């Protein structure tokens, strides 16, 4: 894997943010479960989205790519039914999730709506991410399964039946989303009961909104239980994916530490959970300027605060950079789930930002960060092969006093393939010979 030499830089200008990965996953799945042909626009073909496209194709959806547009004939359309019969006629259908936790956790229950044996494979840390919620359902419904420890090689056979599903809300909302996608298509009614406090509520809001946009109704009883009528049909439609707040957070955080970037295509009333970055940075003292879907931040210094990571775990790495350069103490709580992402993000944040002179104390499910006046450079840092850690360190380099060497930068392709192109466009200085050019 390659390395980049990134120099301290002043970033300025306008940047169009990539489309929301969370919304794109959901739109591809809902349109693939439909009874007709949908058109999904403003798609960014990151590794994770490609994994979901290929997974839905393997189940019978017919998906054609035209620039940033997907035309999708759903599994329950006339064309899709014929294609599905051919696909599922294989002795064992393999679904490659690459490194996408969303693809894996969304597709497992969806695949069980259809006959046949399915094998889920993947790479990286995906095999270490827990699936116990589904294993409990498999045991209760006599669905056969086998798996290997610490790698993704899951084989399942059987069909998911309508039921009352009791699911913990503090593990990952992806399990709930996976069930919400497929239960409306089963032959009778189901119920999901949430047995603990719910984390990542914003992601469920996105799921419920997208499902409704495609013509399926689910009753939400205050996030305590979800009532799902069976025999519903997803309706094909045209759908545009909005800009991604989890990626916009990198540039808003750059503004917070003194850069001058205007971010385009971030909807003000978005349901995305990571839009909480605006409220957090405002609370720390940043002034937010909006003009339609254009946003930028202005600051003359920020103060530490308390950040609850339970509803917005993906933006914690870059907010840790802001906290490191703020006045006073920032405490990040309820962050234990960051340990089971593409890497142990809590540990990676601590190790890599500490190399740059940040003052961080790592606890089991929290970080305590005392602000410093500047960051040091002149060291080698590692992405831990995690896209969000790589982009976080690139933003941190702007406030370093010397260049940094970033190892394994290519992992940004997982969510934001052209991140370093945009970074350079805004004025970031990078030694390009390490980029293979």
Swiss-Prot record:
It comes from the Bacteria. Catalyzes the transfer of the enolpyruvyl moiety of phosphoenolpyruvate (PEP) to the 5-hydroxyl of shikimate-3-phosphate (S3P) to produce enolpyruvyl shikimate-3-phosphate and inorganic phosphate. Its EC number is 2.5.1.19. 3-phosphoshikimate binds at residues 21-22, 26, 172-174, 200, 314, 341. It is found in: Cytoplasm. Monomer. The gene is aroA. HAMAP family: EPSP_synth. GO terms for biological process: amino acid biosynthetic process; aromatic amino acid family biosynthetic process; chorismate biosynthetic process. GO terms for molecular function: 3-phosphoshikimate 1-carboxyvinyltransferase activity. CDD domains: EPSP_synthase (cd01556). Belongs to the EPSP synthase family. Its main location: cytoplasm. Keywords: Amino-acid biosynthesis, Aromatic amino acid biosynthesis, Cytoplasm, Transferase. Pathway: Metabolic intermediate biosynthesis; chorismate biosynthesis; chorismate from D-erythrose 4-phosphate and phosphoenolpyruvate: step 6/7. The active site is at 314 (proton acceptor). It comes from Clostridioides difficile (strain 630). Phosphoenolpyruvate binds at residues 21, 101, 129, 174, 345, 388, 414. It catalyses: 3-phosphoshikimate + phosphoenolpyruvate = 5-O-(1-carboxyvinyl)-3-phosphoshikimate + phosphate. Pfam families: EPSP_synthase. This is 3-phosphoshikimate 1-carboxyvinyltransferase.
């Amino acid at each position: 894997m390659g390395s980049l030499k990134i120099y301290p830089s002043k970033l300025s200008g306008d940047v169009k943010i990539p489309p929301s990965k969370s919304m794109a996953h959901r739109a591809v799945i809902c349109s693939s479960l439909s009874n007709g042909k949908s058109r999904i626009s403003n798609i960014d073909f990151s590794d994770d989205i490609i994994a979901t496209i290929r997974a839905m194709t393997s189940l019978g959806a017919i998906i054609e790519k035209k620039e940033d547009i997907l035309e999708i004939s759903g599994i329950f359309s006339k064309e899709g039914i014929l294609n599905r019969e051919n696909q599922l006629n294989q002795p064992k259908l393999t679904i490659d999730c690459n490194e996408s936790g969303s693809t894996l956790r969304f597709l497992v229950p969806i695949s069980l709506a259809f006959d046949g044996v399915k094998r889920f494979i993947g790479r990286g840390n995906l095999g270490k991410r827990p699936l116990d919620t589904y294993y409990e359902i498999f045991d209760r419904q006599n669905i056969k399964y086998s798996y290997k420890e610490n790698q993704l090689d899951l084989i399942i056979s059987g069909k998911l039946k309508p039921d009352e599903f009791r699911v913990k809300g503090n593990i990952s909302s992806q399990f709930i989303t996976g069930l919400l996608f497929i239960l409306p298509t089963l032959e009778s009614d189901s119920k999901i009961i949430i047995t603990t406090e719910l984390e990542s509520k914003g992601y469920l809001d996105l799921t419920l909104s997208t499902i409704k946009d495609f013509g399926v109704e689910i009753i939400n009883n205050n996030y305590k239980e979800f009532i799902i009528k069976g025999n519903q049909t997803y309706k094909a439609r045209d759908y545009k994916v909005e800009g991604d707040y989890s990626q916009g957070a990198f540039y808003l955080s750059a503004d917070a530490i003194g850069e001058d970037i205007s971010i385009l295509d971030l909807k003000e009333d978005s349901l995305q959970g990571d839009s909480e970055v605006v409220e957090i940075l405002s609370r720390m003292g940043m002034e937010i300027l909006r003009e339609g879907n254009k946003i930028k931040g202005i600051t003359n210094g920020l103060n530490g605060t308390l950040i609850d990571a339970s509803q917005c775990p993906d933006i914690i790495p870059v907010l840790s950079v802001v906290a490191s350069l703020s006045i006073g103490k920032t405490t990040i709580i309820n962050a234990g789930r960051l340990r089971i992402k593409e890497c142990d993000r809590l540990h990676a944040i601590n190790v890599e930002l500490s190399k740059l002179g940040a003052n961080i104390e790592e606890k089991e499910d929290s970080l305590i960060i005392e602000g410093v006046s500047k960051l040091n450079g002149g060291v080698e840092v590692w992405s831990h092969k995690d896209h969000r850690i790589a982009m976080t360190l690139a933003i941190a380099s702007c406030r370093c006093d010397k260049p940094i060497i970033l190892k394994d930068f290519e992992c940004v392709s997982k969510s934001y393939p052209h991140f370093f192109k945009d970074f350079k466009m805004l004025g970031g200085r990078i030694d390009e010979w390490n980029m293979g050019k």
